[in-house]
From Swiss-Prot:
GO cellular component: cytosol; fungal-type vacuole lumen; multivesicular body; nucleus; NVT complex
Active-site residue list: 332, 420
Protein name: Leucine aminopeptidase 2
EC number: 3.4.11.-, 3.3.2.10
InterPro entries per the UniProt record, alphabetical: Aminopeptidase_N-like_N, Aminopeptidase_N-like_N_sf, ARM-type_fold, LTA4H, LTA4H_cat, M1_LTA-4_hydro/amino_C_sf, M1_LTA4H, Peptidase_M1
Predominant cellular place of this UniProt entry's protein: cytoplasm
Organism this protein belongs to: Vanderwaltozyma polyspora (strain ATCC 22028 / DSM 70294 / BCRC 21397 / CBS 2163 / NBRC 10782 / NRRL Y-8283 / UCD 57-17) (Kluyveromyces polysporus)
Example GO BP: protein catabolic process
Keywords: Cytoplasm, Hydrolase, Metal-binding, Metalloprotease, Nucleus, Protease, Zinc
Cofactors that this protein relies on: Zn(2+)
Coiled coil: none
One GO MF term: epoxide hydrolase activity
Length: 656
């Protein structure tokens, strides 16, 4: 279980610091709080890898994979074309996790290797020793034969009974440290390479690259060939195979999914994706990846989306039948610049990926739907951040913006809304104090141009910020950097435009006032409220309405069962009958908060239909808070339908 995924420092192999490069030697003098926290080298070393990545440059990577649904394994070969950076280096160290390594070759000659004992959570270090140091050329090819195992955390396998088509399905999820469970690699966001992939399967395959050709092997399998011309880190690799069909949703975009979902997906995404791309290009610079496709995955997919280049992996909970959840696509698209082109060098600085991406996502949405929409989304995000921090087991550690995972803590354990929403709020604050978008937008272009195809730490970002706004040094010096970056808890709240929220807050306050005044019978409330109150609310406004009701500490809904039931009855069409997963989850949270016992088994049944951790983890926590036996029994029944990461984290939540 993940609560045990922490190793002693004595088990940790500290990376060897690289030689100081030009970027390291020319650092800006930052405010003292930042200067004191600055790592000795920039970018900071990644302590979540056992590889000696700093000794090599990966020029290119070739993947040759076979997918076996019968055995639930992926096997094959990976070949790295490498240059030595450290000329004295005489061994190669790679990351693996639950892999079988069959062979290792350097320039076509077999060499000895040693697979070290597994140390949780980072896996088993693979050490490759050439016969002599001189046999390791300055440029060489490293080829490894391998196979995944039944314990693989990188893949989820579904049999035909678990899919709508009756055919098996497999998909990968490699962020943060699970690429090492798919193939031996330098599993760190600090290094990138171009990729070619040849993947053989009995069913269609998608990959994080552009398809080049499909070869029919004449034995019931086909080999799908892909090319990724932009250098990417290993965690961005995405693979899925199953009964997949596709439809066009824009001039450079397709959606892939199971056949029964195709029409719904085409309707949900058509017309909007290209608008998002064009809006993003105006804010940053032209899209570099060629195509932008979307894979709508099976129900058990654990995240809202994963920014695999050229092929965004998305949750089916985005299909809301009203386009109200499509902002997630704006988020994953924004990753094409923040995260995929410009990447955090380690998971300590994850906010550089996600905070920037949320910021760009909301700028994209604002360009299409108006500035008030951006601020409204930020308000919902603020509530998500507050809920996330309040639910943390260890908020003192995991609610700071810059993390310290250098003791080998699993980055999955630190996953929360903090890097997303706290990161966004910092960038929004900087935009505001520096003069608004007109002043901040040139910096956006400069930052993403400067670090394109590179990895960096937070301090390199701050160097660039202070250099660019040298004429506004006093403004930047006045920022409370300690609170924003290093203190746990909520950040200072920016001033948001509340135009789209005012009616929501007003209605929620009216409900609170009626209840406080003792008007709690069904007749009383039906005289004060009607379905027309929210008929013009969009799904996001309904989400905020339900959030606000639950967060009002003056009203203990568990003491007002009749009022809670009446609210749901009055707004049944907009709330109870909603097919939007965001609304459905908030409805269950409201019902659980009110301790409406009839909702307990209904929530348990819903947890069998979703795999997205945004809903599954808090769903089990809610159920556990009111009916622990039901929560445990539900998880025991359903645990094997969830992704391995989701399963492990829910187990941890229930054991807390």
């Amino acid at each position: 279980m993940l609560s045990q995924f922490t190793r002693s420092l004595s088990c940790f192999v500290k990376p060897t610091p690289p030689k100081l490069n030009k970027l390291t030697r020319t650092m800006t003098v930052l405010p003292k709080i930042l200067q004191d926290a600055r790592p000795k080298v920039s970018p900071e070393l990644d302590y979540s890898t056992y590889s000696n990545y700093q000794n090599f440059k990966i020029n290119h990577t070739d993947l040759n994979l076979n997918i076996s649904f019968d055995d639930s394994i992926v096997n094959g070969f990976v070949t790295f074309n490498l240059n030595k950076i450290d000329k004295s280096c005489n061994e190669i160290r790679l990351d693996t996790s639950f892999l079988t390594v069959d062979s290792v070759e350097i320039d076509d000659a077999k060499v000895d290797f040693q697979l070290k004992d597994r140390l949780e959570p980072l896996g088993s270090q693979l050490i490759i020793n050439p016969p002599t140091a001189t046999s390791l050329n300055n440029e060489f090819n490293l080829k490894l034969g391998f196979s995944t195992t039944k314990d693989c955390t990188a893949l989820q396998w579904l049999n035909g009974e678990q899919t709508s088509s009756g055919k098996p399905y497999v998909f990968s999820q490699l962020e943060a440290i699970h690429a090492r469970a798919l193939f031996p690699c330098f599993d760190t966001p600090s290094v990138k390479s171009t990729f070619n992939a040849a993947i053989t399967s009995t069913l269609p395959v998608v990959f994080s690259g552009i398809e080049q050709s499909v070869v029919d092997n004449g034995n019931g399998t086909k080999t799908y060939n892909f090319k990724q011309s932009v250098p990417i880190p290993a965690y961005l690799i995405g693979i899925a195979s199953g009964d997949l069909v596709s439809g066009e949703i824009g001039p450079r975009s397709k959606v892939y999914t199971e056949p029964f979902r195709l029409k719904d997906c085409e309707w949900e995404f058509s017309g909007d994706v290209e608008k998002f791309i064009q809006a993003a290009e105006k804010i940053i610079f032209p899209y570099e990846w060629g195509t932008y496709d979307i894979l709508v995955n099976v129900n058990s997919y654990p995240y809202g989306g994963m920014e695999s280049p050229n092929m965004t992996f998305a949750t089916p909970t985005l299909i809301a039948y009203d386009k109200s959840n499509i902002d997630v696509i704006a988020h994953e698209l924004a990753h094409s610049w923040s995260g995929n082109l410009v990447t955090n060098c380690s998971w300590n600085h994850f906010w550089l990926n996600e905070g920037w991406t949320v910021y760009l996502e909301r700028r994209i949405v604002a360009a299409i739907h108006g500035e008030a929409t951006r601020h409204f989304s930020a308000l919902i995000g603020w509530n998500d951040l507050a809920n996330s921090i309040s639910a943390m087991k260890n908020p003192d550690r995991f609610s700071t913006l810059i993390q310290n995972l250098n003791d080998g803590t699993d980055p999955d354990e630190a996953f929360s809304s903090v890097p997303y929403e706290k990161g966004f709020n910092l960038l929004f604050h900087l935009e505001t104090i520096l003069g608004g978008p007109k002043e901040f937008d040139p910096f956006i272009k400069h930052y993403f141009t400067k670090f394109s195809k590179k990895s960096l730490d937070s301090y390199q970002f701050f160097d660039t910020l202070f250099e660019f706004f040298a004429d506004k040094r006093e403004i930047l010096d006045a920022v409370d950097w300690e609170t924003w970056l290093y203190k746990p808890g909520m950040p200072p709240k920016p001033k948001f435009i509340t135009t789209l929220a005012d009616n929501v807050y007003s209605l929620a306050e009216k409900w609170a006032t009626e209840i406080k005044n003792g008007n709690t019978t069904e007749d009383d409330l039906k005289q004060a409220f009607t379905a027309a109150d929210i008929k013009d609310f969009n799904s996001n406004q309904i989400v905020l309405f339900l959030d606000t009701l639950v967060q009002n500490k003056e009203i203990q809904w568990n003491n007002h069962h009749t009022a809670a039931k009446t609210l749901l009855k009055i707004y049944e069409d907009s709330i109870v009958k909603s097919r939007n997963a965001e609304v459905v989850f908030r409805t269950y949270r409201f019902e659980i908060t009110a301790q409406l016992k009839e909702s307990y088994p209904q929530l348990a049944e819903w947890l069998a239909t979703v795999g997205r951790m945004k809903f599954v983890r808090p769903g089990y926590r809610l159920l556990n808070s009111v009916d622990r036996p039901l929560a445990l029994a539900t998880f025991e029944k359903l645990q094997n339908i969830y992704h391995p990461i989701c399963k492990a984290l829910v187990k941890q939540d229930l054991e807390a």
